[in-house]
């Protein structure tokens, strides 16, 4: 009996063979298919054989984020179930500590030296440094295949949900749903619309109002005007009403801002939204969310939405646009006196261009609801006002609820043997402004709040962990005794206290040249005149003849001398308290010391000590050290001896010791081969990790 997934694989491959090789090749394929389908497919039951849940940024260590003790105390009952039914311990990430590198490590069983994902934004020779020439969140960045690709070769079908590095899709069977920032599909990020009168915020954000500092906008500054041409009865306003025109992704929505209270403070408190000034889309008080509202958004397929790359003519981009019917949810974050507003739009993160097979997108939305994949974005936007914190918590709840609902869908509606599932919201919480710096005793901000305030913050963080625990409970309920459940994470999070603006240092040394726009805080690098620059997350590029044009690794006495000068200045760098932020510097040819590939790093790789983080921004004040608004991070930290970077590792299923605490922290590279051993599958030769014999029966 041919299964549905076998038939889909057959017809998709057969169609391609007919088109390319004719019916002779088709006949050969059918014979191979008959042989293949005569073999068992490895599916033991109707339940998934493996569910690997990888919440992003879920810190777990024995000192402060004592997750296993919380579980023993009853706070996390489903963590406790997995601990009792399987083995558990801590896992250590790889440098430089953040998401794309460590997901690639988990899913290939290799370090960056082998899988090649040295960073999120990577620069390689032959391309201008102004542009990211290799994106670490893209599946094509990996030099070796991930676990789902290897398993598919053995006719094991994967379901992949919100996994960084999974798109463009690498599997022909199964399901791929919205890989994060992989450059695949039509993704509309949440956005804040903020008063253009707030010049201080605009200057402070600079490029920080865009996805990864170069993508589509995450905050847009707008002006108000008097209301005009409304064809409906507008609510009475006790202050002069104002109007904003919000156009995003080709859809225009008007906002009528008014004061519904008859008092003397002239504080506006409400916004009525309409797409045509004839019908009401939503009428919201300050602090309220709308329901999901239908919108039609336009995506220019000839536009990469990257401010650093050349663009086609506007008419050509316009002709290339396609329309997406989707939904928006609106939050009035904050209002104030005349012309001040802060409004947030979050869009349904799911459409047919973000799911493969595409027809499943509609079914998911109908079954589970519009997708809220994660809260906020990178760089974070919900860090500037007290009301941003409330909005963050509400949006995080939407994300956690959606992912909890998706467990049953993935387990029962996708016909997949193995499932890989991530959620980014834990990372967003621990690297935001509001929590980690005030609850971790290693943070200089720890004493800035009272014990009572800290207890409230801990309560909010532990609630997030409880909701992750709820998702784990739903996973358990959708597995059976023959299934494996694995829980891990890519990295933890460390308190961030001070930003270190290395490019300000290089500008002061006369090694970096730029022009600053004093109005919006954006700047333009003079690459030809710039000899040294820091670029995310841990790379310094050096050329005594300038860094203009396509990047090529320099060499010779002048290069070596300049590189040594830069190293000395970095090692001597200290803040006003004499604390030096540099932990380690290695030359590109020694990148193997940090398990990094030489061809995808800068001329220097520089690691920062905890509480200090490298920032690419250039500021007009030329300050090198600045207290960070964010209070958590994970980039450019050597994780081995920084326990705050550690993560959980729990595994249960046939052949795994029960109620067993792993004696020492493991390495991320050991998770993949352990899973493959338990599944009874061959471990590829490129894998650097080894199975954890300690936990096997």
Language-model segments: residues:
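C-terminal segment of N-terminal export signals and the immediately downstream linker at the start
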Residues: 1, 22-48
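N-terminal export signals
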Residues: 6-27
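A long, amphipathic alpha-helix that forms part
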Residues: 44, 62, 74-77, 390-419, ...
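Secreted, luminal/periplasmic, and some membrane-associated catalytic domains
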Residues: 44-46, 55-57, 76, 80, ...
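Short, structured active-site-proximal loop/turn typified by the sulfatase FGly-forming signature C/S-X-P-X-R
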Residues: 63-105, 109-113, 157-159, 514
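Short, solvent-exposed turn/loop segments enriched in Gly/Ser/Thr/Pro and often Arg
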Residues: 87-107, 161-171, 422-426, 492-495, ...
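Substrate-binding rim/cap in mid-to-C-terminal beta-strand-loop elements of soluble/periplasmic
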Residues: 502, 506-556, 631-679, 693-696
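Short, surface-exposed loop/helix-turn segments at secondary-structure junctions
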Residues: 617-635
